[in-house]
Amino acid sequence: LRFDSKQWSGRVDSISRSLLQWYRNQGRDLPWRNSQDPYCIWVSEIMLQQTQVERVKEYFHNFLLRFPTVFELAKAEEAVVLKYWEGLGYYRRARQLHLAAKKIVSDYDGKFPQDVRALQQLPGIGRYTAGAIASIAFDLPEPILEANSRRVLARLIHFDSPLSGGKSEQPLWDVAASLVPRDGGAGAFNQALMDLGSLICRPVSPFCNECSLVDHCQAYQLGNVDRIPYMPKQKSTQKLEEKAYVLVHEGKLLVVRRQPGEWWEGLWDFPRTIPENMAVRGPQRHQGVISYSVTHHKITCQVLSKMISQRPAVRRHQRWL
């Protein structure tokens, strides 16, 4: 399916006006919208990747208090950045945020590039995030496409092909590019599109009778709102079992640093196997069971404790607490 821009050329102004009027009255009041500082916008967008808005609200303010500028973030130790990210999950985002801050300082003297291609060269910044920064911070007419706006646009043009990322979404990028205002207000338009998707054009039971774009929505007119967008089936949940060892010596507990390629790389955790440099003694005690999820994995972890007969010299990735 290709998007025919000529078909929509006469509707662009009407769609933009209707959406922006709704946004002025009904848009969400979010803390990162009180600024056009590209640093604040960038931090919020990275936090919002795969994390609910309400959760991000809890962390955004404290993160900016600790790292108020890109310079402060760039010079911080990675461990400190990860500590302030703790609880948001997907820690790779924090590492890439830190790396990008260093690059912005070293390559751009701390000033964010305004070109989307240059923005996409920074760690952790893809097409959507680059468009969000460019449009919201610099009011450049750059389109965005994320979960909420994708749903609005798919219903708007009755896009019934499977959405699996990449080239499959190009028609929706074309729609977004055709609609974003060229003469100012691009940031407000993009945020309005996201808010409409979050508040009105919901995945299930959307409030079509309250939607400012209902007169233009082909999915609504064809009675297919509930089945668009068409999303491929998600991966089935995989069940995993593991053991975590609480190794004790004279009141101290051993923790190990997660290695590259492991979940939570760089974070400290109880070992999942008994390290070969540890000599254990006495019985093994069962302390309980913890269940948690990582991506599409559901994990059951047995927590076991053992005493260490003597405390050996720790290796670089080990620590007694």
Task: Annotate each language-model stretch with its function.
Residues 2-4, 8-11, 17-209, 213-226:
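Catalytic cores of DNA base-excision repair glycosylases
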Residues 1-28, 34, 198-321:
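Intrinsically disordered, low-complexity, charged terminal extensions of DNA damage-control enzymes
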